[in-house]
Amino acid sequence: MEKQILEPQLSALRLPAFNVPWPGARSPHAEVIEARMIEWADHYDLLVNDEHRSRVIRARYGWLAARCYPNAAKELLQVIADYFVWFFLADDLFVDRVETVSGDTLRNLTAMIDVLDFNSAGLEPVWGELAWLDVCRRLRSLLQAEPFERFAQGMRLWATTAGLQILNHIRPKSVGIREYQTIRRHTSGMNPCTALSDAANNGSVKPYEFYQPDVQALVRRANNIVCWANDIQSLGVEIRQPGQFRNMVVIYAEQGGSLQNSVETTAARVDAEISSFLELADAVTARANVTLRGLVDGLKYWIRGYLDWVEHDTLRYVDKFAAVDADDRFLSTPQVASRHSV
């Protein structure tokens, strides 16, 4: 189904509210973290112009970090907030809100992988590369080697599965829901985020605990809840994106039925995933040590923190700015890349 057919249905759309039966929290450092995050983004020239800067200010990514990692030490929380603003902007500018593929796509994405692999930037860094290197070096200094590699592997998979997402948008018709779920699980950026959840609470869990099947299943359910809820909440923006617009709701609509019915189908899946997450979380917690309980708590903070951020803090997905925020093609020019090179 072409997005031109779906866009007129947006104005009458009724979006659900999601509820989880555990309390949220927020770091007391939220305002300071947010302000320093903006200063950091300015330092690395991530904000291309005044309009771009205003978009970031109203998104409040530092508040997302404060809600998802409320117990994190201030230094770690600041790195996470800086990572958030970099990731949202890079994901928009490299993948989501530009042409499906351009002459810079491979250069941009491989540069991000190289920073992880070599702990250095290229001779002619692309936009955001030096900021990304700074985030990685600060995280390396705060985490042990194996926990950092969990984060790094999540980011490598973000950059590589972005290629699968691009392939899906080159096709005249989307892949099915199962294939989409695989792509979404990794392009969302949730895996690197949840990889920091234990360190932000009671410390990093041991590898043999982190990779146990039930723990990994719990991480995947947390990932699914946030991703699929976001597919509903960001729908008004994503449908208007020039290159990447097929999410779970849109794919269900392509298979037949109205956009409203597709929202309700996706919402039912989110609710079912929340129930499954709760059941599995109880089972894992029953035999967990202190650090593993911290990971489970961290996943809960992420789910609730994201939902509270959308409801109370951010303007990233509101209708008022959807049309203008959905298109970054005016930013993705050779002049921008050259401006941020050193």
Swiss-Prot record:
Catalyzed chemical reaction(s): (2E,6E)-farnesyl diphosphate + H2O = (+)-corvol ether B + diphosphate; (2E,6E)-farnesyl diphosphate + H2O = (+)-corvol ether A + diphosphate
Site keyed Plays a critical role in the stabilization of intermediate cation: positions: F88
A Pfam family that the UniProt record links to this protein: Terpene_syn_C_2
Residue numbers marked as site, Plays a critical role for substrate recognition: D92
Record-listed Mg(2+) 2 binding positions: D96
Binding site for Mg(2+) 1: D91, D96
Free-text comment on this protein's domains from its UniProt entry: The Asp-Asp-Xaa-Xaa-Xaa-Asp (DDXXXD) motif is important for the catalytic activity, presumably through binding to Mg(2+).
Name of this protein: Sesquiterpene synthase MBR_09977
